[in-house]
């Protein structure tokens, strides 16, 4: 695009190319800047929507499946902005999430890798609409033991599942614990997770200092599972108490208490709750509780009949190790020894066996998907092969039913005579292949079939299709000097005929009356002459500029000409209907009737009708921006009889804004405004920080008053949405007024966007308490 240079007077360049690219003109010649089109981005089969937040490696946007309309979360990973260590961490997260399948873990649905084209990798993950557990805590100040026990059991189940598969999370905190629409926990963000290698210690410093175990803060080598147990204990303390266990006047004092596990027991909790917290928040990892102890703790199973499920599927023993899966297992860091193979074959209850079975399940699912795609490709190839062997009917022509077998036999005889013996053999081979294809898994009963056999099957079908195309093309190599005859002959070879010609008469049909054929030829010539006259009159009217007559004489002559045209067309229709009503036993069923210039039945519309419809559509008045009525000129003339007609769909005119408003967009615009005039509806009250019986309008007034008194920087993002920022603490969050579904209540939802979590909690608590609800 050319750069816009400014002249000495500061005017922007108005070159024709610039104006054409960036502006459009109205009737008065004024420049109207073009509106930017909202381009919809697609990633795979998902439509990208609004931004949900920022993840560890990039933005997270809402996605919608084009077919199922299911919502997903799409993580954008810009590979060129990641360091070598970050790339390793990122793709390790992808490998780990591919292996996990647990109801309380966010599921990775798909990976769209476009590193070579766009330098971006897209992770399609499960969309969790309930927000963070931390926001849920802020909304209630703290959570009662009964509800906290439900969350705890779900977290134990997910963590045990990870540890059993030799995966440690290492970054458990309330911000990475999400709530779905049913209020269940979903563990997310496995960016800092790692594989637990038997006999090896981890040494990476990672996680949040407030939730990290003492061995990580002291930069010691550590085991994986005890680290997650410590973080789980700190999370449960925050859930039950609404604040962290570490207190102090300075950051150094807080860090000291965190490393040594110094905290006071909350007085409002039961003895069982205090005890289970003390078993998890233990500085020495060797003395810290295990998952099995927590599952069987009395507090965990109050009001429950059984301990939390791990959702580990039963594993059958394997009798043979697949080398490709074993190589993948070794790439994850497991030892390549005979002992590892023996453990897998013995099916011992250990992490190596679980990881091997996870990889085995993953490879099996891939093979199933490949098999499905191969079967779909096979069915498509077979369909295209049958379509080429048996050409279907045209929208303007149909093959007579009585001549199907006869015409196909004639075509086959011609192909066998003109083709060499090798091609004849290939055709017989293809027929045998088609018989064998009827027993394929795509049509008959499901049989065991390998991918190699499917590939050979598809390759054979391709050869058959190519041979059939060569046979068809060789039968049409001879062409006469007349191009119209060439077209007619090629159509007759397939049983199809031009819409200007009479019904085709194959040479082998002796039942067809020759006198009837001559009568139809004469009738065809008469129709052609009448159509030529109408075309000449119509073209002369176009050339004489009949745009809207201004004088009365011109209006009268114009109306007379239109009446004459209509009378001639009506006469043609009546004459054609009389001819059609005459009984004729020699005519075949479903033969191609010669259509008149204005046919009533849409299924037998001639080509001239399509051009006529095109002209009528283009001549309809279009409401412009100034309200004037305009006429569009014809860009193409009607085809003559000698020309082979090219069938085109009628061009639909682009509707102006006024005409769209008249056609119903105005009502949708009103409905949209009505939707914006009311607050969003929220399912349940657990997402709201507080509720009130006041109307949304009165709640807005009270919220504005509290925001003015708080001194927060506030920006209104919508009728019921506010963006708030605390400059002192660098905390950014949003407040939204919602309607509670099925309840006559108004809710206030708070969501942290950035900044320290516990400073955000203090600000929100103070703000909600100042509101008189």
From Swiss-Prot:
It comes from the Eukaryota. It catalyses: L-seryl-[protein] + ATP = O-phospho-L-seryl-[protein] + ADP + H(+); L-threonyl-[protein] + ATP = O-phospho-L-threonyl-[protein] + ADP + H(+). ATP binds at residues 52-60, 75. GO terms for cellular component: cytoplasm. PROSITE patterns: KA1, PROTEIN_KINASE_ATP, PROTEIN_KINASE_DOM, PROTEIN_KINASE_ST. One of its GO terms (biological process) is intracellular signal transduction. CDD domains: MARK_C_like, STKc_AMPK-like. This is Probable serine/threonine-protein kinase MARK-C. It comes from Dictyostelium discoideum.
